[in-house]
Amino acid sequence: MYNSQQQNIIKINKQDTDGRLQLFIVDAKRTLRNSSIELESSQIYIDVTKRLIDIASLFCKQEEIQYESFAEELLSILNSTQFKILGKCRELVIKLLTIIAKYARVNQLLGIESKDRSPSSSINKNNGFDQLYDFELNRIDENNNNNNNNNNNNNNNNNKNKTISPTHQTIQATIPSPKLQPFLDHDDKDDKEIIDIVSNKDKDQLNGVDDVDLSNTSGISCKEIFEKNPINFQKSHYRCLSYSPKLLEQQLQQKLVNQQIKLKNGKPSPIKRPSPPLPPPQQQQKEQQKEQKEQQKEQQKEQQKEQQKEQEQKQQEPQKYVKFEIQKSPPSNLLPPLPISSSNISNEISKQQQQQQQQQQQQQQQQQQQQQQQQQQQQQQIAQPPPPQSITSPQTISANNNILTTPLSSQPTQSLETPSTIKPPLLSRRVSDIIYSKNETNLNIKEPIHSKDIIPTPLETNVGGGGGEITKKVVGSEENLLSSSSEEETLSTSEEHDEYTTSTSGEDEEEDEDDDNIYNTNHYEISERKLKNKRPFKKTHVHHSLSANSPLSRKPYESPVFLLDPRLNDLKTSSDEYILKRPLVRSKSFSPNKEEEQIKKEPYRKLARSFSEIPSVKLIEDHNDDSQMAMCRICEEPIHSSLLEDHSKICAMANEEDMKAMNVDDHLRAVAKILLTRSNDIPHEKRKMIIELREIALFAVENGIKENLKMIHIMNDIIKNFDPKDDNRELAIKIQSLISDKVNALKRADDVINSSPRIFRTNSPRILKSPREEELSQTPLGGRLRSDSDPVHQTQIEYKPKGVPTISDFEFIKPITKGGYGKVFLAKKIRTGDIYAIKRLKKSDMIKKNQLDHVKVERNILAYTSNPFVVKMYYSFQTKEYYYLVMEYLQGGDCFSLLQMLGSMDENMAKMIIAETVLALEYLHSHGIVHRDVKPDNLLIDKKGHIKLTDFGLSKVGLLDRQTVVPPSYFSPTLSGKNNQSSSSSSVSNIGGSNTIGSNISSTNNNNNNNNTTGATMVGGHVINTETPIPSNTAIPAKKEKKLLSLAQSKSLFSASSSPSIPSLNLLNSDKPISPMMMGVKGFIPPPPINQQPISNIPTTTTTTTTTTTGQQSQQQSQQQQQTTPPLPPHNIHRKLSCVGTPDYLAPEILLGIGHGASADWFSLGVILYEFLCGVSPFNGSSVQETFQNILQRNISWPEDMSPEARDLIDKLLALDPRQRLGFNGAEEIKSHPFFKSINWKTILTQEPYFKPKIENLQDTSYFDPRKEIYKVSDDFAESCKPFVQNQNQNKESSTILTTSPPSTSSTTATATATTSNLDSITINQNTNANFDDFLYVNFQSLLELNKNYLAEAKPFNSNHRRRNST
């Protein structure tokens, strides 16, 4: 039975051996794979390597095996005369022999015998190693072995005494057989070099010891044997470690400093041990040791002078790298060796602990003496390596392994504290490993460190002992080397690989244990890099130039493979500033060359993360598989599905910057138009400068980075020539600023494309599809033609950038529904096949109804927002007559259609819909957006049953403000001195209000705009008020102080003070009593009777130009209104007119014009919830007046079957005072209401909705059928959109265009159509072009989400290749 200390040694020995064997298997497999490519490789090398792998695998799996049989088999391979094993294969054989020898020797020292091993085999277990030793070191004179036997035994006892690192406990064991020493001393060095640097001490060990009685010898640590050959760790092996290599290096450097300090501190007091009775042979050894000590002291005095001289010479020799073999303690021979026993070990540990305390006390007293002797002793140690007699110098080490005492000091030196113990990984890297480090890195040592016990330096060794010294030169031949010259590859690979992979990430440094599937090109790169550098390794005072050519690789010198990669030619940047920034992806090597690709034939990477894993473009084209190709929605080019994710990111970045440059071009064209107008009104002297500015603006539109950089410098001189008071100077500054913005955008797009791998590159419309220079030179300066997307500015250059949407890119399938200002069509993108919903609005109607600002507001909100409960917009563009919004198509219809089919909803279904609507409104309010038109019609349902909010035409984000707040817009038509905008005077808000509900209610359709009709205002398609007739060609200028702000600027301008005006309705003239809740509203004054109220106090309609003040006229108007207004149908019939604004959902503050904010949306939400549960609006009336009166007086009928929670929520949402309304302080008030107790707000998007539409295909519009029946929308696309088809084919609009009027007013359709045809088309076109110059937009983030959705829905791409850092 073994004690706990011996069991720990056995466990550590097995772990260390298994780790070394695993690394050996990986190295052998890599060699086997690479040797199959070499032309000079023979089959015997492959067979031997495979056998070595099998032996290592078998040895690693078993705990106790007959390792002697493996040693004999490996020795037979080395001694084979038929097959001469050389090069890397020979190195592997010796490496495996070394591992097995270390494992076997530790077991021998512990007295371990295998269960299956007989006594006879135990006696002859070193025969195989003896044969190898005789075979490799036949030049060493063996005649002197018997003469120096006793002397060398003493030397071995002095040099073998180590501690166990996991437990810091000392185990004394027997001396190993000397013929096993070549494998135990084998340190991955060139064998010839090993023989050359053997010292006298080592030679005495090899020649003077043969078969030693293991039971009678001790003094050597087992750990010293199985750790003597350190592993040369590489970066690729760090996966096996659980701690940082940098931390390990710091630990080793600290131990180096401690060891050097201890050696400088003089001779400590020896540790006294119990001396048991010694056998006669050991007593003789002790006497011999005393004699040798006396001789050593005399020789040291004689050699001091020589050491000082040699020190000066060797300090001048340059040493770039110093190789250290770190040992935890120097050897000691103060006391005679003790046999292994548990009692001796325990006694030794207790004595050592006591000695340690004494040493710590003595250390404090001797610190001053140590500082004085430190410099002198350091120079002596560096100057001269230890003489042969130095091996008998008495040294001892304490059991704590932190106190080291030497003969030079009588006091111990306490070492620095080591970091906390880390759990050993699969392969333990110990402190005896070899490290290559520069001298500058060790800041604690002023001079290079040369330890006498690390690497012996004499090239001449003394054979013999005592007084007789026989000098013999150690010479080795190439045939008798322990390993071939290719062992240099192991050293160089370790160092070069460390240097080369310093900048790579941790994931790329890992390697799989199963190297058969590794797509590795580092072997070729490292070998070429090694041949290029050819730097010799310097190991202390021995300088040997290692051969660079290995037997298995005799290729001529070539440049590194990654520098020959042709894809490097494509990696160009516009300036040196961006050289260090590329590539975007993390890469440590480029892809292999064409020859390696033909050999590998590996499939593509699933997601390539570095150049070494990116297949070439040619390989993609050769293996083009339509089933694995996907269409990128951004650049609309096919790309492999495995690369779509990374490509989409780069594509979106490049195209977004390119689109910014295109928008700058639009502004430059607008400025050029302004300059053209101004040039007609100024004197001839200044006209030349204005024309020059216009030419520069148009020149900047058509050219790229280099030309525009020149224009910026030219503009500096032009601006200086302008008078500071000249208005044109501001335009010149604006032109220069726009050109600079364009150059910056193009640079960013160019950098994104050029710094990305070619396989990921995008087809940016401007970078890769720019017009040719020849066409530009032959064409006069002017704006380019952007097809239908920009028909205003036309030149002879018919250039349509790729990626810019136009109407010809879509195939219209059928109409879906129509609203107050346009229609919605189902369309398909021809190139990608995606289905969209396209909202088409006629420009002339937008101008006449003063809705241009609302259209842009809706576009900006859709472009700005990104939320799962808000409809996404992908494109916005225009033609000569129409404006288009391309949005996502939601097949589930809207809540209005759903309510029409169900009549009313279940409370749980309504709760889910309202909850998702609350999240949508919360998102909008957090971004300063008030929807102001929340109703069931605008709540769309997707294919999964979730809600999305749409129709932001009436929304308010503070986008309208006075001109003093915003800088002037240089492309506004008002700067030309003329105002050709034709529009009706919209309702004016109190403070900077927007024309929203008021204009919506007061806007009349084309049916009512004829020359003979009066200024009637339509609400729900019915005449509300009549005024003085207005000619159709009368143009009332809009207010100049109103200006459209960008969405980013408008975020900070959100206010709740604006409200639209209300048409002149007798809202408060009713016989019903005023609600007592209205009396509590602050600032509320009961209105006087209608016959006493001045008519001037009633807001007028937007189409009136004169008002009357007499009571008779007001009474006549009321009578005329009653005569012309037919009775309203029931609620489910007049609800179909909500497209032009249904008053059922208007908040009281909007009707009263006292200012409104986000609370108006919560009021509408309460109305919707009531309508979902009851099937009818809470304020429904037989007329619009009655509906408004019900809202202001809060006349609500509560059904009996409504739950108390629902009633309480509706009651609080319908509060008349906005400050008392639920949600005034935020959406959390609503979300915390008991009605939503069962709602999980965090996971609501993943919950199963109560209504999930059943869709036959992506083009299914069956859930919009109720709206089609109400609006009488025909499914026949040719019939319902005949004028539109003619516009596509003939580029002109028919005069009989389909109007947006409700079907109930069909009697006036013909008249309205005739009126539209008589409009001044020239004026309308001018105004349209002026207000839609900058309308083109592509939402690249939404398109990026389409690519991600495609990857999520499509089947994942399965590759046979496993990435290097995959687990």
From Swiss-Prot:
Positions with biased composition (Basic and acidic residues): 287-326
Enzyme class at the top of the EC tree: transferase
The organism's place on the tree of life at top rank: Eukaryota
Enzyme Commission code(s) on record: 2.7.11.1
Entry-linked CDD domains: STKc_MAST_like
Residues that, per the record, bind ATP: 816-824, 839
Keywords per UniProt: ATP-binding, Kinase, Nucleotide-binding, Phosphoprotein, Serine/threonine-protein kinase, Transferase
Region named Disordered: 140-164, 264-429, 456-556, 771-792, 971-1034, 1084-1134, 1288-1312
GO-annotated molecular function: ATP binding; protein serine kinase activity; protein serine/threonine kinase activity
One BP annotation, GO: intracellular signal transduction
Ranges of biased composition (kind: Low complexity): 143-162, 340-381, 979-1015, 1092-1125, 1294-1312
Compositional bias ranges of the Polar residues kind: 399-421, 1025-1034
Catalytic activity: L-seryl-[protein] + ATP = O-phospho-L-seryl-[protein] + ADP + H(+); L-threonyl-[protein] + ATP = O-phospho-L-threonyl-[protein] + ADP + H(+)
Location of the active site: 933 (proton acceptor)
Keyword Manganese: no
Bias type Pro residues, positions: 271-282
UniProt-listed InterPro entries: AGC-kinase_C, Kinase-like_dom_sf, Prot_kinase_dom, Ser/Thr_kinase_AS, Ser_Thr_kinase_AGC
Biased composition annotated in UniProt, kind: Basic residues: 531-544
Acidic residues bias locations: 506-517
Positions of the Protein kinase domain: 810-1236
Domain AGC-kinase C-terminal: 1237-1347
Family to which the UniProt record says this protein belongs: Belongs to the protein kinase superfamily. AGC Ser/Thr protein kinase family.
UniProt-recorded name of the protein: Probable serine/threonine-protein kinase pkgA
Species name: Dictyostelium discoideum
Gene that specifies this protein: pkgA
